[in-house]
Amino acid sequence: MKLFLILLVLPLASCFFTCNSNANLSMLQLGVPDNSSTIVTGLLPTHWFCANQSTSVYSANGFFYIDVGNHRSAFALHTGYYDANQYYIYVTNEIGLNASVTLKICKFSRNTTFDFLSNASSSFDCIVNLLFTEQLGAPLGITISGETVRLHLYNVTRTFYVPAAYKLTKLSVKCYFNYSCVFSVVNATVTVNVTTHNGRVVNYTVCDDCNGYTDNIFSVQQDGRIPNGFPFNNWFLLTNGSTLVDGVSRLYQPLRLTCLWPVPGLKSSTGFVYFNATGSDVNCNGYQHNSVVDVMRYNLNFSANSLDNLKSGVIVFKTLQYDVLFYCSNSSSGVLDTTIPFGPSSQPYYCFINSTINTTHVSTFVGILPPTVREIVVARTGQFYINGFKYFDLGFIEAVNFNVTTASATDFWTVAFATFVDVLVNVSATNIQNLLYCDSPFEKLQCEHLQFGLQDGFYSANFLDDNVLPETYVALPIYYQHTDINFTATASFGGSCYVCKPHQVNISLNGNTSVCVRTSHFSIRYIYNRVKSGSPGDSSWHIYLKSGTCPFSFSKLNNFQKFKTICFSTVEVPGSCNFPLEATWHYTSYTIVGALYVTWSEGNSITGVPYPVSGIREFSNLVLNNCTKYNIYDYVGTGIIRSSNQSLAGGITYVSNSGNLLGFKNVSTGNIFIVTPCNQPDQVAVYQQSIIGAMTAVNESRYGLQNLLQLPNFYYVSNGGNNCTTAVMTYSNFGICADGSLIPVRPRNSSDNGISAIITANLSIPSNWTTSVQVEYLQITSTPIVVDCATYVCNGNPRCKNLLKQYTSACKTIEDALRLSAHLETNDVSSMLTFDSNAFSLANVTSFGDYNLSSVLPQRNIRSSRIAGRSALEDLLFSKVVTSGLGTVDVDYKSCTKGLSIADLACAQYYNGIMVLPGVADAERMAMYTGSLIGGMVLGGLTSAAAIPFSLALQARLNYVALQTDVLQENQKILAASFNKAINNIVASFSSVNDAITQTAEAIHTVTIALNKIQDVVNQQGSALNHLTSQLRHNFQAISNSIQAIYDRLDSIQADQQVDRLITGRLAALNAFVSQVLNKYTEVRGSRRLAQQKINECVKSQSNRYGFCGNGTHIFSIVNSAPDGLLFLHTVLLPTDYKNVKAWSGICVDGIYGYVLRQPNLVLYSDNGVFRVTSRVMFQPRLPVLSDFVQIYNCNVTFVNISRVELHTVIPDYVDVNKTLQEFAQNLPKYVKPNFDLTPFNLTYLNLSSELKQLEAKTASLFQTTVELQGLIDQINSTYVDLKLLNRFENYIKWPWWVWLIISVVFVVLLSLLVFCCLSTGCCGCCNCLTSSMRGCCDCGSTKLPYYEFEKVHVQ
């Protein structure tokens, strides 16, 4: 990536020595987060210029300006001509430092040319009219994007909507003195890496290909492909229903791009964009192809802090009739609030579409916006998707106006113009992880097998046929009687209601309510009539037929569909299926207004045809020499029809034994036509992710291969040169080389002679050995599997279970076979293995003998004793100040003063001979020394001595601070030296740690390889189960693979027929799975017996069989458990050197006496005329002795000639394998193989010898590394830092006297009030008693009235 560093000291290049060098970009306002490194894309400065006195005019979309001195300058963005209705942008500053700056976006009243900028002052109708103080060296910028003007002011970034701002493409610059300003002309979008700190820009780097955009912006490849490695952060698969969560799937998605248009956050687009990537200011990034696309994908990219980043914006769709507005609001009332969140939103947003037809305004609710909107997709056919899910359908769309801006400079979006293409996608958590285009032959092969990488081997390729094939129809000449049926829907509207359903819909069949076909052929068509009532909403409604419950679609009825009987009706008839008639308003609201009901029966007497025919005719449509889908005399299929020169008198159709159509005769002309398969599946050879060869049935070049070779049974095409000798893969008796060349594979000649010569033979005897550890894995068990047959087949459907009962004991047989095999498996494993309970006891990690692990184990929290200090009440009554002291100065000072402020100076301490006082003084001490200072100033020289205590105390406290700083500096030097030493040791240590980790990683990699081999065995059963589960997706020629869906769509009889197909297919799949499981049990049982033999012979004893316990001479073996099996580690001897000798089977003396070796493992050989014997195991020659030989009768060797029939009389247990297999094959019953591909179970034999060797080498390397690390650790431990400690001193400062006075006054007042309340209430009674006594003794004119008892008087 090419980077340009824009230096912070401006200007650059030729301006550096003439412009003010203090100008920089630290104050540039971009709206980016503080204290962060951010990628910003937009109209930003790159190259800077120094202006002179003349007026300069540039083509620009904006500018940035830096005032560098006490001079005047002016800038204007204009159109180059005067327009009274046009807004212009004008910036000027006054002479002088910190002068005023004028910024205007206004219209001007007179014909100003903007060439001189001298009379551009009379303005009106201003959008922006600012007057502010300039900041020397701070940049000021103005950029234009569409109709949005962005101002980069000194302390803020703001945007304004300016009509026709895109016309302001001329920049006039006037600097009234030389070198009075530095400016940058902006005319292109750039990407900048900006680093901010404390509100300032500390790094400003411009890049052409910034890494920050690689996650969201890419360069489209020439064929419109998205490059490999693109992370698809904000791309989703489009769906009209369920969303794929995880897995690999082949889909048809809009992922072929013709243009990728990045729209930064500092720009906006306000015009319509068309589906051919034209309109507005579309700027494609990289590849561009001028064509009409299917969709436009708007991918929103925002930062994590963009929560509730709301901007006013709308999405406008231009349809054939009118414009439709899409907007969202956080109010469910549907109030027009054109807000679209750019980033995560913290509250729900309700979305509506709005349209205005004539003068009527209509809003329709379409859904709730997701919490985080990452992608918006608009299809040309009217579909609207958010995050991959379809929200509504508008019909055909001509253009889109995505008028959305963001408040954050770091946010942006991209517009991808895409078409639908066949792709293979890997999805994880609904996110696209990988993408493969199914274009080239090899890519199609990958897509056929749903794999992103194919292993080397041969694959069947049958993807050459076109998806859409022409149709061939051939029938016998018959007398045609035709019936035309018109299904008519007439809709009438009334009033001015747009979203209400039609006022009335009349449906009829040829003017009646029902029609039954009585002729041999019929054609039916749907007619929609709209009665014009003057309502403006008529054209917005559409009425069409939907796919209903019939097993055929309405559009296919005329495609030569055959029936025995068929009737149509507009009213429901018992036993009929239906096609609903649906009305939709602008494809947003849907209403069922009727239905077409069909009753039919299977047969061939009535045929639907696309157009009317009558009379005796041969209705045929024959496609020759091309792959076609045919219906020939009721034989249906696909194939290539060719004319033949044969002449056959009998018959009109010719089929094979399997029922396939081979040829037919035209009954009118007598011509014979042959039918061959379209493209028989080819066998392609894949090597290193490419097709290197192909075996085909036709003589033509394919797959980009040119060299064609004709063989007896097939054609072979490749690009090989036919000059190789080594095959990388074999097919039958042919070998395929790396370049695709085809070579014959001949039987390999064995170097071993199976039969020893009677007289002599050349033998190789080992003379040197090496020890080897060989690994062998044997599977001894597999996980038992039990399948609930009824649940698997019927998935709980009760009607399906009733049908399943008719299959008698099918499920019972399957379940019993699995259950019995699992039971036998468990018994065999239990009888074979015994477990030692002591081996599974968990050791206590704290008691490992002499090893103390307490330093590495978690410790319990032990609460330390409380440090002596003041009480809680004292902490409440005093303000505590914590300082760092010198040695014992603070403690000694505190004990000397005993809390008295008057003793402050008298208790001064000395540290290294210098008088010091603690740095903290309370209010009392400050008042005391303030009084001393004021007293020394009252009478000048007479009282100057009174200020001595103040000066001494001040100097002593300054000494305290100075000494404290000195100690800190000394500690800093000690720490720096020790830290540097420690860093050197740590760096060296971690370098060794890095090497050790590297070795460990490589060792773990070898272990991973070994474990993967074991994992393959473990996962075989899971693969089989996965294959069994995948069979549930097959419909087995039923109309659906869902039983419930079948019963929902069809009547009971038809549904039972369809479900019966599912039951048959699923039972067949289940039987195949059970066969696999039983075969696997048999294999595991044999492997278990072999493992038991190896335990007895290899582990418990030493084997004499060469190659049984490892590939060598066995020494000893160790067995360990492994997943589902045992892992044997065989230690064997392997020969490294051999001695070749000419061995003798014996010696013959004078032709009469024969002597042969007594021991079978001895060899007699001759060495330069001297006979010696040696062991076959190890070459140890010695002279023979008499005890080594045994005498035989003579030297003759006699053979007995017998026939194969008589051989069993000599060898009773001899078995002729070939004859046995031949008889077995002849006695096999004839059966038809099920049409299922069975996933093979491969018994895996592991070879971990190379991995173990690597592990041993890595272990030795790790041990050496640990020794080096120990030395480095010792050096690190020696790095001891001895610091001078600053004591932590706590000092309590008393509150001032007036605080205590206030507390005392408050306390006295509260106490008085409390006593008064107690004495004044009845609870105490003191006051009441005293007042009563006094009133009794002397009544001093009390005003209290005496108490009189009232008497009730009745008045007559």
Curated annotation (Swiss-Prot):
Location of region: S2: 718-1356
Listed result of changing residue 293 to A: In strain: Isolate NL
Classification via InterPro entries: ALPHA_CORONA_SPIKE, CoV_S1_C, S2_sf_CoV, Spike_S1_CoV, Spike_S2_CoV, Spike_S2_CoV_C, Spike_S2_CoV_HR1, Spike_S2_CoV_HR2
Main location: virion
SUPFAM superfamilies, per database record: Coronavirus S2 glycoprotein
Variant or mutagenesis effect after changing residue 79 to S: In strain: Isolate BE03-40001 and Isolate NL
Virion surface compartment residues: 19-1296
Gene Ontology terms: biological process: endocytosis involved in viral entry into host cell; fusion of virus membrane with host endosome membrane; fusion of virus membrane with host plasma membrane; receptor-mediated virion attachment to host cell
Positions bearing carbohydrate: 35, 52, 98, 155, 187, 193, 240, 276, 301, 330, 354, 358, 403, 426, 486, 506, 512, 626, 645, 666, 699, 723, 749, 762, 768, 1111, 1196, 1201, 1218, 1242, 1247, 1277
Coiled-coil segments on the chain, per record: 1015-1059, 1244-1286
Effect of residue 197 to L: In strain: Isolate NL
Effect after changing residue 302 to L: In strain: Isolate NL
One MF annotation (Gene Ontology) recorded for this entry: host cell surface receptor binding
Record key words, sorted: Coiled coil, Disulfide bond, Glycoprotein, Host membrane, Host-virus interaction, Membrane, Signal, Transmembrane, Transmembrane helix, Viral attachment to host cell, Viral envelope protein, Virion, Virulence, Virus entry into host cell
The keyword Membrane is assigned to this record: yes
PROSITE patterns according to UniProt: COV_S2_HR1, COV_S2_HR2
Pfam family, one: CoV_S2_C
Subunit structure, interactors included: Homotrimer. During virus morphogenesis, found in a complex with M proteins. Interacts with host ACE2.
Main function: S1 region attaches the virion to the cell membrane by interacting with host ACE2, initiating the infection. Binding to the receptor probably induces conformational changes in the S glycoprotein unmasking the fusion peptide and activating membranes fusion. S2 region belongs to the class I viral fusion protein. Under the current model, the protein has at least 3 conformational states: pre-fusion native state, pre-hairpin intermediate state, and post-fusion hairpin state.
Protein name according to UniProt: Spike glycoprotein
Source organism of this protein record: Human coronavirus NL63
